[in-house]
């Protein structure tokens, strides 16, 4: 397995459970990938953008959990915009029956091989 990579996870708060599933996959001993979640858990405030940008800069890449909720999540939109300026971004669809597209984000089906390929490319 490649060295452990630091990954920032951008997600709409409504998709927090999916973020938890992604983190759980990384802890699975049979998982072909592992990462450190750098997402900002604090509530949105005046220094939030500064903290997000700092964490994205310290990350090797960004995974965006894409769903219909992404379209109305101002926080996730800003995280993705910042990430596109700073790092490599991979979108993964958060749900099997939701194929929302975000402009400028390469989004793929949530599979271990797809995530492993992205992480190994960092």
Which role fits each region the language model picked out?
Residues 87-91:
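Proline-centered loop/turn at the N-terminus of a beta-strand
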Residues 69, 92-100:
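Short beta-alpha junction loops
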């Amino acid at each position: 397995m490649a060295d452990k990579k630091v990954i920032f996870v951008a997600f709409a708060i409504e998709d927090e459970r999916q973020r938890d599933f992604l983190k759980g996959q990384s802890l699975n001993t049979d998982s072909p990938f592992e990462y450190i979640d750098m997402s900002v858990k604090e509530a949105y405030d005046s220094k939030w953008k500064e903290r997000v940008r700092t964490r994205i800069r310290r990350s090797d890449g960004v995974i965006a959990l894409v769903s219909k909720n992404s379209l109305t999540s101002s926080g996730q939109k800003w995280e993705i915009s910042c990430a596109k300026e700073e790092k490599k971004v991979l979108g993964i669809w958060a749900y099997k029956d939701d194929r929302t597209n975000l402009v400028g984000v390469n989004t793929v089906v949530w599979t271990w091989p797809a995530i492993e390929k992205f992480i190994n490319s960092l």
